[in-house]
């Protein structure tokens, strides 16, 4: 017996149904952070935003540095101490610190400078009580600018340390 031909409207309906099923299977799941509602509320209160790799402080709020400097000013130290204590108060005791530079200077020098910047933030977190073993320090040099390095304001935005509470 020969197979029956499908009516064009049924064929179209079958094709659309298959397409919908295929697309539904491709949906990206939201990141699972493993954090409580209280922890998320504290992260948001402190200025963290949810990104692909976790909760990041350093997008709308930044820890900025002067040109060729790796030392924190007193206001930045106070802000960082407040953040570290707030995180620890809700049992968030693991962070990644990513230091960055603008594009002025030698690539190797900027790499080391970005590491020193991240380490200066790590020192404040350790002083606030965060275990040293739970603080990951990365220097990314000038590889990930968030602003145009052609302007003074852009270069200033790129001299920063991002604080990330990893998604687990």
Swiss-Prot record:
Location of the protein in the cell: Cell outer membrane
Stored PROSITE patterns: OMPA_2, PROKAR_LIPOPROTEIN
Cellular component, GO, one term: cell outer membrane
Regulation of protein activity: Both lipid anchor in the outer membrane and peptidoglycan binding are required for full activity. Once activated by certain cell stress, the dimeric YfiB transforms from a compact conformation to a stretched conformation, allowing the periplasmic domain of the membrane-anchored YfiB to penetrate the cell wall and sequester the YfiR dimer. GMP enhances the binding affinity between YfiB and YfiR.
InterPro entries: Bact_OuterMem_StrucFunc, OMP_bac, OmpA-like, OmpA-like_sf
Outcome reported for the amino acid change (mutating residue 55 to L): Exists as a mixture of monomer and dimer in solution. Is predominantly a dimer. Crystallizes as a dimer
One Pfam family matching this protein: OmpA
Residues linked to a lipid group, S-diacylglycerol cysteine type: 26
Phenotype upon changing residue 43 to P: Is predominantly a monomer. Shows a much higher peptidoglycan-binding affinity. Forms a stable complex with YfiR
Keywords noted in UniProt: Cell outer membrane, Lipoprotein, Membrane, Palmitate, Signal
Reported function: Activates the diguanylate cyclase TpbB/YfiN by sequestering YfiR at the outer membrane, which counteracts the YfiR-mediated repression of TpbB/YfiN at the inner membrane and leads to increased c-di-GMP production. May act as a sensor of envelope stress.
Family: Belongs to the outer membrane OOP (TC 1.B.6) superfamily.
Official protein name in the record: Outer-membrane lipoprotein YfiB
Organism (species): Pseudomonas aeruginosa (strain ATCC 15692 / DSM 22644 / CIP 104116 / JCM 14847 / LMG 12228 / 1C / PRS 101 / PAO1)
């Amino acid at each position: 017996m020969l197979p029956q031909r499908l009516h064009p409207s049924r064929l179209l309906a079958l094709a659309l149904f298959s397409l919908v099923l295929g697309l539904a299977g491709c949906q990206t799941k939201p990141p699972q952070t493993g954090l409580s509602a209280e922890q998320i509320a504290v992260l948001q209160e402190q200025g963290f935003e949810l990104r692909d790799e976790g909760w990041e402080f350093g997008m709308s709020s930044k820890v900025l540095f002067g040109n060729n400097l790796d030392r924190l000013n007193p206001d930045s130290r106070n802000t960082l101490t407040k953040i570290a204590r707030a995180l620890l108060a809700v049992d968030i005791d693991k962070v990644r610190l990513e230091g960055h530079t603008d594009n002025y200077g030698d690539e190797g020098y900027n790499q080391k400078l970005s590491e020193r910047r991240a380490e200066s933030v790590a020192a404040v977190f350790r002083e606030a009580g965060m275990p040293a073993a739970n603080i990951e320090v990365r220097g990314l040099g000038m590889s990930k600018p968030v602003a145009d390095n052609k302007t003074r304001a852009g270069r200033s935005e790129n001299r920063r340390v991002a604080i990330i509470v990893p998604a687990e």
